[in-house]
């Protein structure tokens, strides 16, 4: 992550150490290990190991395909998870708020409220246009998304 973006993240998020799986912690180059405590299957089925949590190979292939750097990619298990993770990363519970313009995808509100983040709903004006004045009036230093 580039330092110029750090100011947008919650302090507690920046202080976290990246997750390391048991496979990374106990890596042994000399022999293949089966980590039964990680619920790995020692038998040769097609799904006998957990995938790489950092998705290094997948990001590398997508980056090559799209002609971008792999650190420009963020992958999630669908839009619900992505929205939740964005709110967790940027919004301080009980302090910050997000703004939504109904009708919109319901998970913005559900995720924000689940994590203790206030939701300000800004109604549309005629012909489903944004009310930019209302958005600007509702926005302040605690507006995050």
Task: Give the location of each predicted region.
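N-terminal "arm"/small-domain region of PLP-dependent enzymes with the aminotransferase-like
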Residues: 1-64, 145
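A general structural motif
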Residues: 31-33, 70, 94-95, 142-143
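Short glycine-rich anion-binding loops that position phosphate/pyrophosphate groups of nucleotides
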Residues: 39-42, 79, 105
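Phosphate-binding glycine-rich loop
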Residues: 59-97, 115
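Conserved PLP-anchoring active-site segment centered on the Schiff-base-forming lysine
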Residues: 89-111, 125
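Short beta-strand->loop structural element characteristic of the AMP-binding/adenylate-forming
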Residues: 118-124
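Active-site phosphate-binding strand-loop segment of PLP-dependent enzymes
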Residues: 126-145
């Amino acid at each position: 992550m580039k330092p110029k973006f750090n100011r947008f993240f919650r302090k507690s998020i920046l202080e976290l150490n990246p997750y390391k799986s048991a496979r990374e912690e106990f890596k042994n180059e000399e022999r293949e290990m089966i980590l039964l405590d990680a619920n790995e299957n020692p038998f040769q089925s097609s799904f006998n190991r957990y995938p790489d949590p950092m998705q290094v190979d997948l990001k590398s292939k997508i980056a090559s395909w799209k002609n971008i750097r792999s650190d420009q990619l963020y992958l999630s298990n669908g839009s619900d998870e992505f929205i939740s993770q964005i709110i967790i990363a940027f919004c301080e519970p009980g302090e910050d708020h997000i703004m939504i313009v109904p009708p919109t995808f319901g998970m913005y509100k559900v995720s924000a409220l689940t994590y203790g983040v206030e939701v300000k709903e800004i109604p549309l004006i005629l012909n489903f246009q944004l009310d930019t004045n209302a958005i600007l009036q509702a926005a302040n230093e605690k507006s995050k998304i």
